[in-house]
């Protein structure tokens, strides 16, 4: 997370410095001499995203002279409306930048289009926004994150090597419309095909551990 934080902040600061600062609005971002960056996460009940938020806060604490940081997120990863509301709140607050891990690759694009129209720098992390939807809104939002497809392929190769050639495989994915979920499913299916095995069921757990456990034990 440290390397990602440095990259994100470098991109944001360079962009924000070139923005027009002639506005006399009394918003959050204008009240400070340094840019205000909003980190909009998925579920902060998920340890993975809590660790990401902690890493960002640690970086800001070490570089407090460069920027301010506002961290927020949703509790349930399927609560897309709440994450849209958070983006709109950040727009109203007048932040200079929004770094977002979108809960959905499509549903967040209209809200982020409003942010860009307001002159806010937007950076996409973790779950990539759907390129086709971005094109519809004439948006170019940079993405910083891993290749979920390659990662899932590697995981599949490792897991399947211990199974018989005629094994049947079940896939339990996250939110079906999320880009990272699609990429992970695709990568794992490639591993299954390469191992000459068959996927017999595909179900969505919506990134919910309780739901995933219920589906697995059913």
Segments the model singles out, each with a brief description of its role:
Residues 17-218:
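A residue-level marker of the well-folded mature domains of exported/periplasmic proteins
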Residues 1-9:
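Sec-dependent signal peptide recognition
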